[in-house]
Amino acid sequence: VEFRGAVRPRTLDRKATPLRGNALAMDWNPERARVEAEANRTEHWGHWGPYLSDRQWGTVREDYSADGEAWTYFPFDHARSRAYRWGEDGMFGICDDHQLLCFAPAFWNGNDPIIKERFFGLSGPQGNHGEDVKESYYYLDNVPSHAYMKALYKYPHAAFPYDDLVAENARRSRLDPEYELIDTKIFDDDAYFDITIEYAKRAPTDTLVRITAVNRGTQAAVLHVIPQLWFRNTWSWSAGQPHGRIAPRSGVSNAFEATHPDLGTYTLYYEGEAEALAVENETNMRAVFDVENAQPYVKDGIDRAVRGERGATNPDLVGSKLGLHYTMTLASGASQTIALRLTNIPPAGEPLGAEFDPIFAERKFEADRFYAALNPYPASSEHHRVQRGAFAGMLWSKQFYYYVVRDWLRGDPLQPPPPESRNAGRNHEWLHLYNDDVIAMPDTWEYPWYAAWDLAFHTIVLALIDPGFAKRQLIMLTREWYMHPNGELPAYEWALGDVNPPVHAWAAYRIFQIEHKMYGTADYLFLERVFQKLLMNFTWWVNREDPHGTNVFMGGFLGLDNIGIFDRSATLPTGGHIEQADATSWMAVYSLDMMAIALELAQHDPAYEDIASKFFEHFLYIAYAMNEGDDTTGLWDETDGFYYDRLDLEDGRRFPMRVRSLVGLLPMIAVETLQPQLLERLPNFKRRLEWFVANRPELARNVASLSAEGLGERRLLALLDGERLGRMLKVMLDEAEFLSPYGIRSLSKCHQEHPLSVNIGGVEFRVDYEPAESRTGTFGGNSNWRGPVWFPLNFLLIEALQNFHFFYGDSYRVEFPTGSGKLMTLWDVATELSNRLIALFLPNANGERPFNGAVEKLQRDPQFRDRLLYYEYFHGDNGAGLGASHQTGWTGLVAKLIQQVSEYESAGKSPLDWEYEAMPASAVEPEIV
């Protein structure tokens, strides 16, 4: 096997050693070669990709209002007519990596009031559970270089039910389920088109496009297909900015040239009879603001022309936006394909000639080979389908994101000045922030903006297929034009200063381990770069979130929107503050992750040994404060065998907040094992460890097994010792509490019969078990951490169980489920939880995929039942998908779980069966998740 990878840093030059026993023998293939070429900067295959957002309207970036109501300032009804300032959107579109030139298809069924050029959905205020896309579409395939991509859109023959979707969701309360497109019955008689969009690259800047429509209905139907090419409007905001131009290519039929000073010239070739329609990508001022237009051919002119309006487009066929209008009549079951090609390379022959279809076939074959090499284990075809679908969704979710806070606050010279109040409003403390990158988004319609902790989980999945991109994402987030000068990482555009869990050190080390294991590359330069910046972030956490110096942390909502009885980002109605079990757990995890990275780097630079000792001490102090401390700090409840947040009132009274939630389970994830070989190689660190055991026993006894040695003479650093771990697992693995058929619930089911209620000044604050959507409007009401199953924290709990097993071995067994009498090792429990999560997407004994819920059409119809959606979260009892429907972001972690389960089950063993030499030579623990 030939291993290729990143250049080693000058001071950390240990050679990458292919690993015995657990290294994947990755077959070299063309797609792997393209990924390596991109990483090594020899070919820029990532220059073009699916970087066009699904939604730009309703975002903070486009909001110039005084009140910060982004949804109402730029609503869906403006999107077809109003130029965007900070980005573009479209359906299954592509663009260059700075989004100068964009391509996307649009459609019209002859019945809709507008052409379908972007996905429709409800804004936050319109939805009974917040914003929600109301379309039927699927990401089918993609590869890291985007040399092959495929997606599917289901478009009804009848008029799209825009008004019905808005009205019915407005009628429903938060106690009702969302009203989805499938609920309108518009697909019941199969009167719709299946439209497949495929892209294949012949070269990095030579993209072939194939759009195929199939009539699934019993009657003939007319479909209009309008491929569109346009330049992002960069010229309407300040003088002297480049203005792209699209015009017919001289002397060549069925071809248009798109020329831009910074991008050069691209040609769009197209086949067949299509009516060319050209306009400027500029606002229709008459339609939006009821004032005169500066020129006659504006952004929505193509929409109006397709629907029959004359004079809406430029007869000279020149502009900054082009539409090619095809009309096709399809009999029942019939299909038709349109071929296009966007390139800056002169074709050797006919641009849409004999090589066109073979290039698609070749790229599809290479994609199959790429994924077959990635997971060569004998998993079921369904496991492979689910894994590949997760990778596809993750890659389709890469989006160009542009946001310069200083310019956004000040406004643009050629536009009316924004309200003065904005200078003290949203994100005004982030004037340094300058984002101009391709970023892996949580969901490109519902969450078309990065979220700091989501992104960390995305990189774990991306590291399997494109470690170079995964590493660049983490490095990007820690660069000085993202990270605040005080060390804080930007959370998300709605509130850059909100606090997200500090999972980035964990992600960095996992990426390092995954790449080392799968590709034989140990990229110490990456690890060191991220570590140095995270030192600043760790310091920010210590200085800001532990204001009392007790090593018990606050932090705010920490990504778990409505999990507590109070809004943890707001001023408490009781006064005082909350000492948070999850914030403190996260800091314990952060300390251990930074220690692990420092120990890895200390193998090559002794200076890191002292830093590792510093983080070791941080962990000891946090463990003491959380587990024991004095009368004012401990969060462990000995009676309940659980961790709770604590409410500290201003008069000195303190009350545990007895909510059984993931907050109380999070201390379990603070776990790290130390190899004996590592301690021998780092004598200074070992001496410091042993000094604490001898001289600070009150600190050492709060760590699981600092002095006692476990399997293989390993040491265990954890907040939970074996006894407390067992007590917490008894609760976590109880089907009447946390254990769902599909993973670990975010809130114990015990609160279904025993809700927690507090009355303050006549106002009731209450926590109930809510296994489906949220019944409150907290944080927009579109997320719910009071019962559903979420992938990211399930993933961390699974990893924690594996790490505990790495120390305790097979002798430590627990009941699974609690009360069943069946004993399992911690490794087997982790595997069972993994399989329960994976089962959300697999056909059950009745042939039904749990994520599709009780919708008969989705479960039984052959055109729907095998199409996969990776929802934001899942019903705590029946597994139905909820929230954002295309959040392959962190739900894409199912791909990593499938990889792990496939590998270890095929070998019939856990990592404990491997020889230590098969592990990275200086690893704190093996890469086991």
Predicted regions and their residues:
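Acidic, mature catalytic/reactive cores of soluble proteins
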Residues: 3-8, 17, 22-81, 93, ...
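Structured, charged N-terminal subsegments at the starts of enzyme catalytic cores
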Residues: 90-94, 103-106
